[in-house]
Amino acid sequence: MPTWEELYKNAIEKAIKSVPKVKGVLLGYNTNIDAIKYLDSKDLEERIIKAGKEEVIKYSEELPDKINTVSQLLGSILWSIRRGKAAELFVESCPVRFYMKRWGWNELRMGGQAGIMANLLGGVYGVPVIVHVPQLSRLQANLFLDGPIYVPTLENGEVKLIHPKEFSGDEENCIHYIYEFPRGFRVFEFEAPRENRFIGSADDYNTTLFIREEFRESFSEVIKNVQLAILSGLQALTKENYKEPFEIVKSNLEVLNEREIPVHLEFAFTPDEKVREEILNVLGMFYSVGLNEVELASIMEILGEKKLAKELLAHDPVDPIAVTEAMLKLAKKTGVKRIHFHTYGYYLALTEYKGEHVRDALLFAALAAAAKAMKGNITSLEEIREATSVPVNEKATQVEEKLRAEYGIKEGIGEVEGYQIAFIPTKIVAKPKSTVGIGDTISSSAFIGEFSFTL
């Protein structure tokens, strides 16, 4: 039986040959500028005391729906630190946005799931991508890598694809403030169990899912050379503003479905319950969905599976049997053909179809994530090979044993109720340079990789 190390080596060689064969990926809808701040515990403690420690602690127990005060901002950051979990909230208040701006940042990077995936797939893997950018400022355009990355523009009613840097306008800056902390980061008596981040979105375009005219009026033309699509960005919507953007998303999905283009939804933490319900209602129009334990638990709550939702968040590592049960419920409820679950330490994929290529795509994705964590940025497909030196997560052995006992998993592949379940232990980078964009790297690499293995 091959070892995980052998399976990993085989998967990256396969991916290097096949990924560049993918001829076009559509990426929507959220692209922004990430202002990354590496937190300092003394500075954070001082800010918490100044804002009112008691009030801040209250918000670190339970997240607000959105941020309107400095104590809500600091409490939300503390919520993430205490759990080692990522979260993202909309910053509605201008004074809080100004506070964040004055607090500053250490670096500016490409942000938003579509933007991050565009740089990875187009700039690193060399796969042609068409990306939706709600506001294309000069600063935003310059954060795109060189390579086959395109934005559609309308010239005399005709759709023209250009690299973002060739765009002649200068629209608004959409900035998301990202507060990063390492494992063991201490604030008062609290300690982060693992590295992660909190995101405050100070942006009125991505947060309302503003969709450009080209994607509303000329969508069929925009996607004429596309083989796959990945959509994201629905997470910031609220019950007050979701209706209009959802209509546009549904009409885009109808066109993609008519052309039999597989579409992946990259789920993200969605605070609004009504929006989660609506996402669940349209999930059947997607071929695939990607999510983590917090996101899966939030969907189980909508399905009335409160006990299962609690179970998903109760253990570290996350209980794979609970995850599989939740994925089965989601697949049966929506008809989605592929569910990719990623958590710290292992990935699972539940698919209607069978084949080792599903597992191999997860292995490729885990290597891409490890390479990104190790280096901060990947510059080529070949560079991902270097991550084969990162050790496989030992804690995942107990996960694998549970899956073997329950579903007879062998070499990472098993069967459950007519579906295939694929499992892989990930590679853990002890001191990652950054955690931003790792989830997007995992999901897009797995989806594109799996498709490329069938070409």
Swiss-Prot record:
ADPK domain: residues covered: 2-455
Residues in the signal sequence: none
pH dependence: Optimum pH is about 7.5.
Residues noted as binding D-glucose in the record, renumbered to the chain: D34, E88, G112, Q113, H176, D440
Keywords: Carbohydrate metabolism, Cytoplasm, Glucose metabolism, Glycolysis, Kinase, Magnesium, Metal-binding, Transferase
InterPro entries documented for this protein: ADP_PFK/GK, ADP_PFK/GK_arc, GlkA, Ribokinase-like
Residues involved in ADP binding: E195, N292, H342, T343, V429, G439
Name recorded for this polypeptide: ADP-dependent glucose/glucosamine kinase
Gene source species: Pyrococcus furiosus (strain ATCC 43587 / DSM 3638 / JCM 8422 / Vc1)
Lineage per the UniProt record: Archaea, Methanobacteriati, Methanobacteriota, Thermococci, Thermococcales
